[in-house]
Amino acid sequence: MAGCRLWVSLLLAAALACLATALWPWPQYIQTYHRRYTLYPNNFQFRYHVSSAAQAGCVVLDEAFRRYRNLLFGSGSWPRPSFSNKQQTLGKNILVVSVVTAECNEFPNLESVENYTLTINDDQCLLASETVWGALRGLETFSQLVWKSAEGTFFINKTKIKDFPRFPHRGVLLDTSRHYLPLSSILDTLDVMAYNKFNVFHWHLVDDSSFPYESFTFPELTRKGSFNPVTHIYTAQDVKEVIEYARLRGIRVLAEFDTPGHTLSWGPGAPGLLTPCYSGSHLSGTFGPVNPSLNSTYDFMSTLFLEISSVFPDFYLHLGGDEVDFTCWKSNPNIQAFMKKKGFTDFKQLESFYIQTLLDIVSDYDKGYVVWQEVFDNKVKVRPDTIIQVWREEMPVEYMLEMQDITRAGFRALLSAPWYLNRVKYGPDWKDMYKVEPLAFHGTPEQKALVIGGEACMWGEYVDSTNLVPRLWPRAGAVAERLWSSNLTTNIDFAFKRLSHFRCELVRRGIQAQPISVGYCEQEFEQT
């Protein structure tokens, strides 16, 4: 019987898709009809409900109203349409927006409510939500429901939607160290994230290759660690702009400063921070991970992370902790002496000592933290509210077994392993990402409730501003729908039709999103 209900629901979804072909991600509940209403661009407006907690002056929604009016109709004037069918003349010139709780000057967080309802019928055109963040998601859905006839008339169908995200953390990671991404590329990415209902920008700011974050506490890190200290850095103003731009789109900024590995770019600007490597009994002239044996290391980290904690308002920081190469530590006699003094018998214990000390430092600043899975694998003692991000896809531990182990230990988990978008293969590889079920591991309902979402990751070894957009979009949309929509929304044919239309909508909005199959868009990219 359950299988029969699922089959019927998929048939219904396919039928509805004919009326809502560009809806992405698919809502939790939707009813839509052939009855349609005309939208008049010259007169259309967004308006606050008289009882809404948010009113004019709420910058989050005021700015969103301007954005979506421009996305829908542009800035030009439109002639009044003429009709042969009287049914088409019933117009909808106002979308009324009602919010229960005004959070207009706040930042979104992991607990933010994004539910909304959208009702379009003869009597009303109403978007209702508990928060401004839910209203933002509803505005995006509304914009996708509007369509234009061959004659140039805008319509919207009679529709009822009740929608909410399946997971609260739906992220995109950008790596701005291996290749510097201009500020405009980051802001453009935030725009398209909002179109896909992503709500976390995981900013992998620094790595071995470069240190583009401009630190006001340790300016030499940027001067000596960036590719170019004038053109290839993110100033304090740049960072503030990213954070505010994201906030206005309901997106959190999760900043990552990965240590003790992935820190070679830190060395030139912070003498004594990295471990000197030895070749036999002599210094080799090279450096390895952060030196965990010196008190000065922890003084430095304490000062730097105090700054970072003040710059980035989100409760969580990402502290990395992955891929620590022990070779240099093994070669260094001072490290060996420190380990002997501490009673450490292997280098995982040394790594754990460093990470545990860093976690304690960050905790003192009233921050939570996200770490890569190695921190859990190496049995570092962490707070119960730590979030573990799973990224390793290969054996010996398959990523679903890792999810099982992490949640069994009582920790919250994020999944990224199957969603590395920098890895490209010929053909519609978005389907592989779409088919991933984040809860497809053996575990109790309590374990599965600890999976709070996941992230699509775009690492930068072979990605810069020349190929970021087409490599990211619309492929990341597969992850967006998996993290937003119901676990029953899995039909590939249904997804293909909608994603094809959504890709064309992205192109219409000026996004150079790559095609997912043979075909065309009514408005091609060079025409935008």
UniProtKB/Swiss-Prot annotation:
Region (Critical for hydrolysis GM2 gangliosides): 422-423
Reactions catalysed: Hydrolysis of terminal non-reducing N-acetyl-D-hexosamine residues in N-acetyl-beta-D-hexosaminides; N-acetyl-beta-D-galactosaminyl-(1->4)-beta-D-3-sulfogalactosyl-(1->4)-beta-D-glucosyl-(1<->1')-ceramide + H2O = a beta-D-3-sulfogalactosyl-(1->4)-beta-D-glucosyl-(1<->1')-ceramide + N-acetyl-beta-D-galactosamine; a ganglioside GM2 (d18:1(4E)) + H2O = a ganglioside GM3 (d18:1(4E)) + N-acetyl-beta-D-galactosamine; a ganglioside GM2 + H2O = a ganglioside GM3 + N-acetyl-beta-D-galactosamine
Keyword field: Disulfide bond, Glycoprotein, Glycosidase, Hydrolase, Lipid metabolism, Lysosome, Signal, Zymogen
Assembly with partners or alone: There are 3 beta-hexosaminidase isozymes: isozyme A (hexosaminidase A) is a heterodimer composed of one subunit alpha and one subunit beta (chain A and B); isozyme B (hexosaminidase B) is a homodimer of two beta subunits (two chains A and B); isozyme S (hexosaminidase S) is a homodimer of two alpha subunits. The composition of the dimer (isozyme A versus isozyme S) has a significant effect on the substrate specificity of the alpha subunit active site.
Function of the molecule: Hydrolyzes the non-reducing end N-acetyl-D-hexosamine and/or sulfated N-acetyl-D-hexosamine of glycoconjugates, such as the oligosaccharide moieties from proteins and neutral glycolipids, or from certain mucopolysaccharides. The isozyme S is as active as the isozyme A on the anionic bis-sulfated glycans, the chondroitin-6-sulfate trisaccharide (C6S-3), and the dermatan sulfate pentasaccharide, and the sulfated glycosphingolipid SM2. The isozyme B does not hydrolyze each of these substrates, however hydrolyzes efficiently neutral oligosaccharide.
Tissue specificity remark: Ubiquitous. Most abundant in testis, adrenal, epididymis and heart. Low levels seen in the liver.
Gene Ontology BP terms: adult walking behavior; carbohydrate metabolic process; cell morphogenesis involved in neuron differentiation; dermatan sulfate proteoglycan catabolic process; ganglioside catabolic process; glycosaminoglycan biosynthetic process; glycosaminoglycan metabolic process; hyaluronan catabolic process
One Pfam family here: Glyco_hydro_20
Regulation: Addition of GM2A stimulates the hydrolysis of sulfated glycosphingolipid SM2 and the ganglioside GM2.
Family listed: Belongs to the glycosyl hydrolase 20 family.
Protein name, per record: Beta-hexosaminidase subunit alpha
Matching InterPro entries: Beta_hexosaminidase_sua/sub, Glyco_hydro_20_cat, Glycoside_hydrolase_SF, Hex-like_dom2, HEX_eukaryotic_N
Disulfides per UniProt: 58-104, 277-328, 504-521
EC number(s) reported in the record: 3.2.1.52
Keyword Hydrolase: yes
UniProt main location, coarse: other
Highest taxon in the source lineage: Eukaryota
Signal sequence annotation: 1-22
Subcellular location: Lysosome
Species of origin: Mus musculus
Active site, renumbered: 323 (proton donor)
GO CC terms in record: azurophil granule; beta-N-acetylhexosaminidase complex; cytosol; lysosomal lumen; lysosome; membrane
Glycosylation sites per record: 115, 157, 295, 487
